[in-house]
Amino acid sequence: MADQRMDISSTISDFMSPDPADLISSSLSTSGMDCNRKRKGSSTDYQLDGFPFEEGMDTDKDDQHGRLEYTDQQGRIKNAREAHSQIEKRRRDKMNSFIDELASLVPTCNAMSRKLDKLTVLRMAVQHMKTLRGATNPYTEANYKPAFLSDDELKHLILRAADGFLFVVGCDRGKILFVSESVFKILNYSQNDLIGQSLFDYLHPKDIAKVKEQLSSSDTAPRERLIDAKTGLPVKTDITPGPSRLCSGARRSFFCRMKCNRPSVKVEDKDFPSTCSKKKADRKSFCTIHSTGYLKSWPPTKMGLDEDNEPDNEGCNLSCLVAIGRLHPHVVPQPVNGEIRVKPTEYVSRHAIDGKFVFVDQRATAILAYLPQELLGTSCYEYFHQDDIGHLAECHRQVLQTREKITTNCYKFKIKDGSFITLRSRWFSFMNPWTKEVEYIVSTNTVVSTNVLDSGDAAFPQLAASPHSMDSVLQAGEGGPKRTHPTVPGIPGGTRAGAGKIGRMIAEEIMEIHRIRGSSPSSCGSSPLNITSTPPPDTSSPGGKKILNGGTPDISSAGLLSGQIQDNSGYPYSDNSSILGENSHIGIDMIDNDQGSSSPSNDEAAMAVIMSLLEADAGLGGPVDFSDLPWPL
């Protein structure tokens, strides 16, 4: 019995003692379970009565479960690796299929006899895309030629219409491959003299670099060599020539000077020194040629040229410039009368609405001899000749009422030395878009030459008759004799003293007209520059005087609202006539009277009239009595 128990104990101890490999597999289980198992395996409190192997069987199940978990984990890792490899393989296969499809679409790759590496295929595809750039609307050569015309007939028609010569030049060396017979009419060279020669030998030395630049930058075909990434050797392509295309990047248009084979004149040595005659004999004249055309590509075999012997020929197409050269004249045709056209001498000035200078261009100093600061703040009427003031005042009034440009007749402008220069001006007014008021007048003044004034032809009809003087315009409506004005010491002859007041009175008149039109109910939607409308109903004062705007007496006869007339209703409106025309009462006479009648009594009377007008305008008084005025009405 004791022996039997010893055998059972040894069997259990052998069963409970794990193998080192089993210890490694059981390490995947928790540490608590390992400790439990060790304590259970080392303890001697086993209940062997009736259940001698139950605890050992539980431990075996745990070990088997750990082994199964380890096997499953190893299987999952292996399956994940296999799945990743399959994904990478499918990706590589898909990329290879796309590269093969791309190689079949690129002509340079499709023409290769051997399989290219991926990098070379991608490089050729990029260069092919660069070639197609800009050729969104390609046209073949057949689309440019009508069916009923042959090639020779079309060539002759083009040369006749272009009045030039056709030439074909290779882009690599500048060799003239073809030139039409019409080159003899322009360069005096025959067709045989130029074919096969270098174009650079017939160009001006300073134009060679420019022509080389036009020939080298080709966009019609790839000009750089393709290198295999594996071997490092240049790739030779055998491209089947297709229909040539014209794209916008291949267009060329440039000017260059070419030698003209003009017949030389024999120079005798006795007339000129030997060195001078030799230089003149060797000197060749050049003519300017305007070349327009396209860069095109042909295979060397199609051109009929022996290009196989050239060392740098790598099977690429021959890129050429096909252009038409036309003679560009050196001298612009002059008028029949031999007059040389030059840029007109002019300067720009800016004036306030009363004609005072607010800006003067710096070019005015070279024309008028005035510095800009000498003209600023002065009125332009102070420099006008007295015979031209009437016409210029008319233009001044028009430019304040319209937005159009006003061109004056030729007039005389006083320069710094006291003499006069003839000018013609273009005036236009600038209106503030917010306030709708004229802010300033811009004048472009052009100097008129003396021969234009002397001609007086149909181009300048206003020059045939001299403009009316200021006095004649003012006296025409009154029928009185022309007054003689005294000469003011210190003022050069030809100008009028106090002429600067004319511009101020014109500006005040236009402002008064705008004020009246702005207060009129019928002019609410009209422009402030439009001063013509239908007169409103009659408004009269109790004393029989004409009242304006419900209380303002009619003072147009006194010259304060000149340029207006009255109808039967008594409302003043403009007749669109000049402020200095026949119906006007503002002029040099009034200016001279104002200068000669400056006294305290006159000033007090004028102030009393102004106060009465203000009271009547505000409705504070009755009609104004003008009998106390020192001047007649």
Swiss-Prot record:
Here the cross-link named Glycyl lysine isopeptide (Lys-Gly) (interchain with G-Cter in SUMO2 and SUMO3) sits at K259
Cross-referenced PANTHER family: CIRCADIAN PROTEIN CLOCK/ARNT/BMAL/PAS (PTHR23042)
**Which GO terms of the cellular component aspect does the record hold?**
cytoplasm; PML body; transcription regulator complex
From the record, which residues define motif Nuclear localization signal? 36-41
InterPro entries named in the record: bHLH_dom (IPR011598), Circadian_TF (IPR050933), HLH_DNA-bd_sf (IPR036638), Nuc_translocat (IPR001067), PAC (IPR001610), PAS (IPR000014), PAS-like_dom_sf (IPR035965), PAS_fold (IPR013767)
Subunit composition and interactions: Component of the circadian clock oscillator which includes the CRY1/2 proteins, CLOCK or NPAS2, BMAL1 or BMAL2, CSNK1D and/or CSNK1E, TIMELESS and the PER1/2/3 proteins. Forms a heterodimer with CLOCK. The CLOCK-BMAL1 heterodimer is required for E-box-dependent transactivation, for CLOCK nuclear translocation and degradation, and, for phosphorylation of both CLOCK and BMAL1. Interacts with PER1, PER2, CRY1 and CRY2 and this interaction requires a translocation to the nucleus. Interaction of the CLOCK-BMAL1 heterodimer with PER or CRY inhibits transcription activation.
List each copy of the PAC domain by range. 408-451
How does the record describe the protein's post-translational processing? Ubiquitinated, leading to its proteasomal degradation. Deubiquitinated by USP9X.
The answer to whether keyword Ligase applies is no
| Taxonomic source organism | Tyto alba (Barn owl)
User: What protein name applies here?
Assistant: Basic helix-loop-helix ARNT-like protein 1
Q: Which residues carry the site feature described as Interaction with E-box DNA? A: H84, I87, E88, R92
Q: Which UniProt keywords apply?
A: Acetylation, Activator, Biological rhythms, Cytoplasm, DNA-binding, Isopeptide bond, Nucleus, Phosphoprotein, Repeat, Transcription, Transcription regulation, Ubl conjugation
Biased composition (Low complexity) is annotated at 518-528
Cross-link position per record: Glycyl lysine isopeptide (Lys-Gly) (interchain with G-Cter in SUMO) = K266
Q: Where is the composition biased (Polar residues)?
A: 24-33
Q: Where is this region: Disordered?
A: 1-65, 472-499, 518-555
Q: Where does this protein chiefly localize?
A: nucleus
The record's subcellular location field reads: Nucleus; Cytoplasm; Nucleus, PML body
